């Protein structure tokens, strides 16, 4: 019988970012209690040798599973020492992978208080609205002018420590495109 390969999208992440993610998840599960219903699985609770941890986030009948890996092949940079993250959507036997932005939006919708586009209409009609958004990572696009006015009126509180963001976890801070400096500021262009 031939080997059967499965392809997974694994985001390369440095070790310190994964450690920060794990700490934030545990803090908000056990101390602040903002991550109610989440479950954390340690590496020794998994049968797969490369799984470092799993965070199971229930969304009604669906489950979001964020898995961190170690011992993968080294990445293209020396700080990518074989660490990675996958984000999976599970519903019964159906499984698919989703991107970090969508994961943050789903977590935001199900777990954290927020005033959204419906709040604009409620505010105009004079109804009482939720005063602020607790999970800013869930807003990945610029809102309407009314929404921006509401956010300017009611500034979001900074939570210490911040809520765990999947997008922040997989963000690539080293491979951002280099900005070229002007002729005067570039040493290589001047030949000095």
UniProtKB/Swiss-Prot annotation:
It comes from the Viruses. Residues 171-192 are annotated as: Disordered. Residues 14-17, 74-79 are annotated as: Interaction with host APOBEC3F. Residues 171-182 have a biased composition (Basic and acidic residues). Processed in virion by the viral protease. Keywords: AIDS, Host cell membrane, Host cytoplasm, Host membrane, Host-virus interaction, Membrane, Metal-binding, Phosphoprotein, RNA-binding, Ubl conjugation, Ubl conjugation pathway, Virion, Zinc. Residues 40-44 are annotated as: Interaction with host APOBEC3G. Residues 151-164 are annotated as: Multimerization. Residues 54-72 are annotated as: Interaction with host APOBEC3F and APOBEC3G. Residues 171-172 are annotated as: Membrane association. A motif (BC-box-like motif) lies at residues 144-153. The record marks 150-151 as: Cleavage in virion (by viral protease). GO terms for molecular function: metal ion binding; RNA binding. Residues 75-114 are annotated as: RNA-binding. It is found in: Host cytoplasm; Host cell membrane; Virion. GO terms for biological process: viral life cycle. InterPro entries: Vif (IPR000475). Counteracts the innate antiviral activity of host APOBEC3F and APOBEC3G by promoting their ubiquitination and degradation. Acts as a substrate recognition component of an E3 ubiquitin-protein ligase complex: mechanistically, Vif hijacks a host cullin-5-RING E3 ubiquitin-protein ligase complex (ECS complex) and the transcription coactivator CBFB/CBF-beta to form an active E3 ubiquitin-protein ligase complex that targets APOBEC3G and APOBEC3F for polyubiquitination, leading to their degradation by the proteasome. The BC-like-box motif mediates the interaction with elongin BC complex. The HCCH motif (H-x(5)-C-x(18)-C-x(5)-H) mediates the interaction with CUL5. Belongs to the primate lentivirus group Vif protein family. This is Virion infectivity factor. The lineage of its organism: Viruses, Riboviria, Pararnavirae, Artverviricota, Revtraviricetes.
